[in-house]
Amino acid sequence: MTAPSQVLKIRRPDDWHLHLRDGDMLKTVVPYTSEIYGRAIVMPNLAPPVTTVEAAVAYRQRILDAVPAGHDFSPLMTCYLTDSLDPNELERGFNEGVFTAAKLYPANATTNSSHGVTSVDAIMPVLERMEKIGMPLLVHGEVTHADIDIFDREARFIESVMEPLRQRLTALKVVFEHITTKDAADYVRNGNERLAATITPQHLMFNRNHMLVGGVRPHLYCLPILKRNIHQQALRELVASGFNRVFLGTDSAPHARHRKESSCGCAGCFNAPTALGSYATVFEEMNALQHFEAFCSVNGPQFYGLPVNDTFIELVREEQQVAESIALTDDTLVPFLAGETVRWSVKQ
């Protein structure tokens, strides 16, 4: 006779960093998020990027059209900051409830970021307006100078961009997204109530050895790149401490298999199907399940000034095998932990 499975009931979570893409990809991936999460901050790095209220309204409608019947899901839209963005357009979108936040991509830091910001000074009027109206700034925190080693780009960003920016605009709310280093974990922990961070499941579960030793694993390749184990451990300790300004942001970033498994593969992990169970596994390993619900469902809304979700979901602790692939028009998607046996999954 088998022992009954352990069940974990939590308030419905939100995903504070998500890529849904567009077209057939969007239609394929949306249900994996909408069946679990109440809301998600949707990244604006389409081609062309989402830089106007009209573009965000249209994109939001395409997302909602892809949500299956019976799923209660609200996409929260973001504006892609560019050197030429009009502060009035940004404020209009925020006041009309279209834009929840704005995203700063340093030019060429990640997928579809060629339109990104060349320098903070170039967008200072926009940032000053955001500070004035209370609009959160979401930051991909890496410098992009060719001479800076890829493993050092986050730490260098803190000292050269993030700290000077926050010193200059002291009332600006900032989310340091997908942090990957001890430097960033310490920086956020020591920051004030206007600084928060998201962390992905892959950066909590893995380090660069997992990606590079015994063969290259392209489906663990994302940006910011996985770091050495001391950084992974610092991230795990941050979430396990119950610190309330760090929250769930999967950075789920789907690419077709042929774009990941190539001579010059794309960065991004499609983790939407397995992320929540992955986070639960980490919290269990850290003996910190008492902080799991806050990380997933409470800390994010509190920072954004939004209500928590009023429905609940359950995770069950029983071994399940993750699908090897997911059909995508004329290709496939490879989910995070494909083919592996996982300990926690959302109860259907």
From Swiss-Prot:
Keywords: Hydrolase, Metal-binding, Pyrimidine biosynthesis, Zinc
Residue positions binding Zn(2+) 2: 103, 140, 178
UniProt-annotated catalytic positions: 251
N6-carboxylysine modification, residue list: 103
GO BP annotations, alphabetical order: 'de novo' pyrimidine nucleobase biosynthetic process; 'de novo' UMP biosynthetic process
A Pfam family it matches: Amidohydro_1
Residues where substrate binds: 19-21, 45, 140, 223, 255, 267
A GO term, aspect molecular function: zinc ion binding
Family: Belongs to the metallo-dependent hydrolases superfamily. DHOase family. Class II DHOase subfamily.
Pathway field: Pyrimidine metabolism; UMP biosynthesis via de novo pathway; (S)-dihydroorotate from bicarbonate: step 3/3
Cofactor binding mode and count: Binds 2 Zn(2+) ions per subunit.
Cofactor: Zn(2+)
Organism: Escherichia coli O17:K52:H18 (strain UMN026 / ExPEC)
Record protein name field: Dihydroorotase
Known partners and oligomeric status: Homodimer.
Enzyme class, spelled out: hydrolase
Record function comment: Catalyzes the reversible cyclization of carbamoyl aspartate to dihydroorotate.
EC number: 3.5.2.3
